[in-house]
């Protein structure tokens, strides 16, 4: 198979070999780890040409290959990983980062300058909220948000009136798992020439493909499902080449690229991404149904249980409900903590998407930097628990949840 030839192969086939030729590395079946800080040029002229491209001093010629210079700019492991990360999303290009937050911050800083505007949906990940509400505001960037329970016409009018440079949405939302219509916001963004950015961490790249619905840029915390083993912190951005090229220039000077070892580990993880995520989702569906029937559970937040317009959006743009579940128990923070402390199989930890099942308390953990009044406004309560479902035996997981719920 040609290392960049896709033919009619599915992503599950391409993900094993795309972007790499064994002849490059003594016929090694898998890419080695290119643990080097710098690369040798064949000639001084090559060095000059490579830097011209790296620093955007000229456009790449059609048949020209971008050469290797220094691992802050590019590295073989990263280039192979970036090639493969385009497959599931059918993206033109990809940039990989040292964390999900570095992917978000580098992308935002690429396109916003003092005086610009950004509109974002809420709720969303607590770290992103802090970046927008504190860091961006300190740079004299106008930050506006909208709530999913707001009147739709009011939201549209806000965006059309303010004409933000960026519209940023996270769907499903973290931790309330509400759906946002990507296609609708794409139409609005194109009308005012905004950039639509979608955080697709909870469902992607298997169960939701935002580029197909008009997103310009898709962001991942690759730490989560893409890695799937809770042993790498990384981020990724996929999308159209014109946007990714600009993001890569910013990444070069901010130094937010990931390292060769993490890239190699992510290449390993990509090979099992789909089968892991399918098993996690299969488990999650059964667990969500169990929770819905338990007397000590007040409400379950899961895309499969969406109603009305929310369910319509889910059916239109999602290929499955994923493996994240949130629920409100009957009680308060003390009750929630008692439940968490009685878990045996589930681990009390933040993050998500790994092979092991995790449970956390958004009010006091992942979203603790959000004001309490704001948390209540966006649907985060003291009694909310967020679960990341792993690949364990599903009955063991259900039994664990049952015994902990029965003790509150």
Enumerate the predicted regions with their spans.
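N-terminal glycine-rich, Lys/His-bearing helix-loop that initiates the first secondary-structure elements
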Residues: 1-61
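PLP-dependent enzyme catalytic core of the Aspartate aminotransferase-like
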Residues: 1-3, 9, 92, 133-134, ...
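Conserved PLP-enzyme active-site core in the AAT-like
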Residues: 2-6, 17-24, 93-296, 301
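Acidic-histidine catalytic/liganding microenvironments
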Residues: 88, 291-295, 343
């Amino acid at each position: 198979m040609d290392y960049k030839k896709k033919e009619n192969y599915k992503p599950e086939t391409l993900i094993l070999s795309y972007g790499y030729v064994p002849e490059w590395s003594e016929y090694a079946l898998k890419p080695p780890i290119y643990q080097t800080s710098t690369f040798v040029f064949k000639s001084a002229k090559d060095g000059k040409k490579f830097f011209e491209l790296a620093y955007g001093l000229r456009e790449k010629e059609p048949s020209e290959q971008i050469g290797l210079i220094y691992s802050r700019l590019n590295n073989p492991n990263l280039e192979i990983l970036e090639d493969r990360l385009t497959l599931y999303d059918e993206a033109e290009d990809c940039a990989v980062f040292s964390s999900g937050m570095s992917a978000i911050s580098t992308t935002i800083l690429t396109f916003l300058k003092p005086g610009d505007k950004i509109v974002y949906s809420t709720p969303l990940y607590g770290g992103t909220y802090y970046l927008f509400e504190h860091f961006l505001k300190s740079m004299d960037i106008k930050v506006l948000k909208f709530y999913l329970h707001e009147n739709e016409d009011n939201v549209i009018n806000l965006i059309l009136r303010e004409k933000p440079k960026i519209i940023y949405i996270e769907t499903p939302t973290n931790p309330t798992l509400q759906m946002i219509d990507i296609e609708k916001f794409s139409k609005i963004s194109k009308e005012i020439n905004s950039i639509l950015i979608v955080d697709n961490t909870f469902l992607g790249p298997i169960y939701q493909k935002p580029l197909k619905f008009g997103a310009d840029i898709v962001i991942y915390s690759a730490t989560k499902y893409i890695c799937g083993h809770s042993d790498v912190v990384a981020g990724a951005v996929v999308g159209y080449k014109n946007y990714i090229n600009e993001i890569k220039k910013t990444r070069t000077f901010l130094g937010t690229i990931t390292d060769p070892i993490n890239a190699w580990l992510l290449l390993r993880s990509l090979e099992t991404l789909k089968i892991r995520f399918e098993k996690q989702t299969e488990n999650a569906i059964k667990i969500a149904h169990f929770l819905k029937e338990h007397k000590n559970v007040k409400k379950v937040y899961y895309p499969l249980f969406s109603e009305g317009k929310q369910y319509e959006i889910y059916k239109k743009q999602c290929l499955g409900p994923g493996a994240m579940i949130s629920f409100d128990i009957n009680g308060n923070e003390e009750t929630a903590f008692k439940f968490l402390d009685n878990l045996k199989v589930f681990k009390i930890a933040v993050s998500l998407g790994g092979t092991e099942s995790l449970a956390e308390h958004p009010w006091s953990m992942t979203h603790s930097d959000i004001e309490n009044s704001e948390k209540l406004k966006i649907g985060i309560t003291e009694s909310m628990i967020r679960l990341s479902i792993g690949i364990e035996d599903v009955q063991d997981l259900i039994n664990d949840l049952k015994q902990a719920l029965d003790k509150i």
